[in-house]
Amino acid sequence: MISLLHVSLLAMLQLSDTARVFPPMQGQNLEGRTLEMPRDFAGALNVVFIAFKREQQADVDSWGAALDSLRKRHAELQVYELPTLGRRYRLIRPMIDGGMRRGIPDPTVRAATITLYIDKGPFKRALGITTEDRIEVLVVDPRGNIRWQRSGPMTPSLRAELEAAIGR
């Protein structure tokens, strides 16, 4: 019988065996600046959250304490949120982005929130995302190499994995 630990180890090995690169992408942050990703990711390591639904914000927020702790130890760590919507929503982009902007009082968080209005299929395939029902959490280096990738809200085991990926 295969244990949960074995399944987790196999998943980690599969990711390292099929190393992924963050696909070139353009988006605009909630401060109105256009960014080219991964080129404009500013950290030596970047934690990137990809969310597909409004209600997934709670899952993104669940990582907050872990990230606060990591940023105290790693000043070069940057965090980005990428709300990811289909192209058809571009027509109402001002309304969507304006609503998010009003809901985020911190200009630093707004600058790191980059809404994508894209053809989601190729983006998800490039990242190996099979469902929009969970958030994706990635650690991306300055070259766009994905060092770590998992799905869902923070758990103690995922926190330990993230800390190991970043280097305690």
Please provide the spans of the model-predicted regions.
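Hydrophobic alpha-helical targeting segments used for export or membrane insertion
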Residues: S3-Q14
